[in-house]
Amino acid sequence: MNNEDKKLQDEQLQKETVEAAETVSAEEEFVEITAEEMQIARIAELEAALLSSDAKVKEAQDNVLRARAEGENVRRRSEVEIDKARKFALNKFTEELLPVIDNLERAIETADKNDEALKSMIEGVELTLKTMTATVEKFGLKQHNPVGEVFNPEFHQAMSIQESADHEPNTVMLVMQKGYELNGRIIRPAMVMVSKAAAGSVDMQA
């Protein structure tokens, strides 16, 4: 092999070496780019999973809050319904009881207290009325006996109006039937006779 051939062979070998080195460098660069892209993709995947987890946690928290709120609403509605049922039952019972109280009061008022034979019976009726009244008062029943009070249509029902020189106009002169309220609500207005100015007199309230 002469020098020229050897030179050509060396050049060819050098060229192949350079090409091989360039190929290896390109492959290494490709591997580096691919690894970086995979890392970015993995990070994006993890971020997406984290966001999804956060959304699921928030959804679960919202569900818990809604369940608690609904439970509280159910509890409150139940309490209201129970209270309504209790008040309705108590109101109904009281309305049925009022005529009994009225009859006991009338029996005492009309009884001949001078009759010794009736004395023990009257005392028994008075004790019964007192016990019954004290019992129903514990449940919020209050009696209205508005003699001498100014007439109030919210609490009184005027059965008649009479002239009177002894009473201020619009004053309850007589109670025909006592009124009652239960826990602050009127269940029966008092039936009353109301005064008005006597004919020929001057109404100072006018």
UniProtKB/Swiss-Prot annotation:
Family: Belongs to the GrpE family.
Disulfide bonds: none
Quaternary structure and interacting proteins, as annotated: Homodimer.
Protein name: Protein GrpE
Source lineage: Bacteria, Pseudomonadati, Pseudomonadota, Gammaproteobacteria, Vibrionales
The keyword Disulfide bond is assigned to this record: no
Positions of the UniProt region annotated as Disordered: 1-21
Task of the protein: Participates actively in the response to hyperosmotic and heat shock by preventing the aggregation of stress-denatured proteins, in association with DnaK and GrpE. It is the nucleotide exchange factor for DnaK and may function as a thermosensor. Unfolded proteins bind initially to DnaJ; upon interaction with the DnaJ-bound protein, DnaK hydrolyzes its bound ATP, resulting in the formation of a stable complex. GrpE releases ADP from DnaK; ATP binding to DnaK triggers the release of the substrate protein, thus completing the reaction cycle.
Subcellular location as annotated: Cytoplasm
GO MF entry, a single one: protein-folding chaperone binding
GO CC terms: cytosol
